[in-house]
Regions:
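N-terminal nicking endonuclease/strand-transfer module with a His-rich metal-binding environment
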Residues: 1-386
């Protein structure tokens, strides 16, 4: 029988992708060279510096997700005008400081107040060799946020600790925004550290950032979780920021119009939208359900019944996860409105691909626009949700 410490370690390795599963084999060194390396450097991690996560983070975040605790969010907006060259950095600092109205805080704890001090900071960056109109990305813009009613001071303290640990050898500034429902902080991090190594965060690095951010939040008394969508049986991505902001202003993005047209065509032809990633999702679901079963069984054996029950609850949540695409959900909503029948979630089987046809009623444009399509095929310049 595994010891509790061994189970924690194996769960940590699995949730981060180091091993194929609890008690599974290692993925090998090539995996970590691909997912954690500074560009042009043989050492360090692509996601910056920072110490190791606390042992047991895997189980802690899974049980937190089972309790429905809020998920931490980290986003990296992809805007060349806010990151390329000194001009891009200046644009971003103007934006996050609200043109100098909000104080920035640097990696040494110094406050940078007003446009004049921001300009002094930019002069320092220029002396580091950052060109005004460089085509290269010279700063990484990171947004860390939490749900409404999160204590803003504790959030800010957690972000500060996260930045100090994750970007230990980089110059950075941070600022908090409280003008939206979701309190959030902006980080502007220089890509090169003091040794000349360049940040090159990969997907697994970004997830590790979320885990570290959650760790810092808990240290400051904010209960939260950091899991992937698949860990919770969630398969639809959140609406991208740019289309959401356009919609909130009463406009329609090209993403919305494109998918409204695709929905109209599907409704007119009575053709249920396909799910191109269904087989991949089913395979992922099977792996996660299997791992949750192993973890729950080991916890029961070790006498941790409460934690085992939480993992079992999470397992059922994944088993019952709705694998429909955003387009399929919109199609079902439109049919419900046309036929006056309740929308039903499709089970996790091939039935999603071969839904039986019903009497087609020609839809109106209003029907399509009421569906709230938010799926985007092309995420370029829309930012990354992790």
């Amino acid at each position: 029988m595994k010891s509790y410490a061994q189970l924690l370690e194996e769960t940590d390795d699995w949730i981060l992708g180091r091993k194929t599963g609890v008690g599974g084999r290692s993925r090998g060194g090539s995996y970590w060279r691909h997912y954690s390396s500074y560009r042009g450097s043989s050492g360090g991690g692509g996601g910056g510096g920072g110490g190791s996560l606390k042992k047991g983070f895997g189980l802690e975040n899974l049980t937190a997700a089972a309790q429905g605790l809020p998920e931490v969010m980290i986003k990296i907006p992809r805007r060349k005008g806010y990151s390329n060259g000194l001009k891009g950095i200046a644009n971003n600092l103007d934006y996050i400081s609200r043109n100098g109205e909000l104080d920035l805080e640097d990696n040494n704890g110094n406050l940078i107040s007003g446009k004049s001090e921001i300009n002094e900071l930019l002069e320092e960056y220029s002396m580091l060799g950052i060109e005004e109109d460089s085509k290269y990305k010279e700063a990484l813009n990171v947004v860390l946020s939490m749900p409404p009613n999160t204590d803003p001071e504790r959030l800010k303290d957690a972000v500060r600790d996260f930045a100090k640990e994750t970007f230990a050898h980089h110059r950075w500034v941070m600022v908090q925004h409280l003008d939206t429902d979701h309190p959030h902080c902006h980080l502007n991090v220089l890509m090169r550290d003091k040794y000349g190594n360049r940040l090159n965060p990969r997907k697994n690095d970004l997830y590790e950032w979320r885990l570290r951010f959650a760790e810092k939040l808990r240290e400051h008394g904010i209960q939260c979780a950091a899991t992937r969508r698949q860990h919770r049986g969630k398969y639809q991505k959140a609406e991208q920021a740019v289309p959401r902001h356009i919609r909130q202003r009463g406009g329609q993005s090209w993403v919305f119009r494109q998918h409204a047209e695709e929905l109209m065509t599907a409704l007119e032809n009575n053709a249920y939208p396909s799910s191109p990633f269904l087989q991949q999702q089913l395979a992922t679901q099977g792996v996660i359900v299997s791992e949750y079963s192993k973890i729950a069984q080991e916890l029961y054996k070790l006498g941790y019944g409460k934690e085992a029950a939480m993992i079992s609850r999470l397992k059922k949540q994944v088993e019952n996860g709705d694998m429909r695409t955003s387009m399929q959900i919109a199609f079902d909503k439109a049919r419900e409105k046309q036929q006056g029948q309740p929308e039903t979630a499709v089970g996790n089987s091939q039935k999603q691909q071969t839904r039986s046809e019903s009497q087609s009623t020609k839809p109106t444009q209003q029907t399509a626009t009421q569906c709230g399509i938010s799926l985007s095929k092309n995420n370029k310049d829309k930012g990354i949700d992790i």
